[in-house]
Design a protein with these regions (language model features):
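Rossmann-like S-adenosyl-L-methionine
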Residues: 1-226
Length: 227
């Protein structure tokens, strides 16, 4: 593939490893040609265009308008006709209404910035309930945080780090998330409810203990004053 990259657009600097990274993402997506794919934080459409020939349709979303213009050009120069791109803040573009209008994704590929995904974006993804999510991250810490937020509904199917920046502590990490069965989801939600209830009870007991201690101290002080 050929790519046009403008001065305001993001592109992986290590092109050889970038190819390996995109191959891993495509492998994890396990496309058959029938899927509607959402590519979140698409940048110049590199992953979107890379997987397009394996999908029925790919929708890319990116915050930077100039990058989206590059993404459209990149589809054109590579004769790719099954992509659509939208520019705007992810939490404002990716909504339940957007999915109703454009179709429920079979697969979501997400490659957010170091800060990870906004909670509203995660909730919309959970509402959409795709069969698979491929999460590409340059920050394993925020990736782990986001995976925890999706743990009730998705399980980790595979993990593959890619050394994009040799001789540095930085790494790109690709995680495949697979939708849990209905029975598994029900059990996970039950366990979470029990944990939350236990935490609430422990907090209430601690507050009651503190109150009783304060009342006892006040009573002792009153007795001292009476003496």
């Amino acid at each position: 593939l050929k790519f046009k990259v403008g001065p305001k657009s993001f592109y992986q600097t290590n092109t050889e490893q970038a190819y390996h990274l995109y191959c891993v993402a495509r492998e994890f997506a396990n496309l058959t040609g029938k899927e509607l794919v959402y590519d979140l934080y698409t940048g110049t459409g590199t992953i979107a265009n890379f997987v397009a020939h394996k999908a029925k349709k790919v929708i890319g979303i990116e915050y930077v308008p100039e990058a989206i213009e590059d993404a459209k050009v990149n589809s054109q120069v590579n004769n790719i006709e099954n992509t659509l791109f939208y520019a705007g803040d992810m939490k404002d573009i990716l909504t339940d209404d957007f999915i109703t209008q454009h179709g429920r994704p079979d697969v979501i590929i997400t490659d957010p910035p170091r800060a990870g995904m906004h909670p509203d974006v995660i909730q919309v993804i959970l509402n959409a309930a795709p069969g698979r999510i491929v999460y590409v991250s340059c920050n394993p810490a925020t990736q782990a945080r986001d995976l925890q937020l999706m743990d009730d509904y998705y399980k980790v199917g595979a993990v593959q780090p890619v050394d994009m920046f040799p001789h540095t502590p930085h790494v790109e990490n690709v995680v495949l998330l697979e939708k849990r069965s209905d029975a598994d989801i029900k059990q996970k939600l039950k366990e979470r409810k029990e944990r939350e209830q236990a935490i609430a009870e422990a907090k209430a007991a601690k507050e009651a203990e503190a109150l009783a201690k304060a009342e006892a101290q006040a009573e002792d002080l009153t007795e001292e004053e009476q003496k």
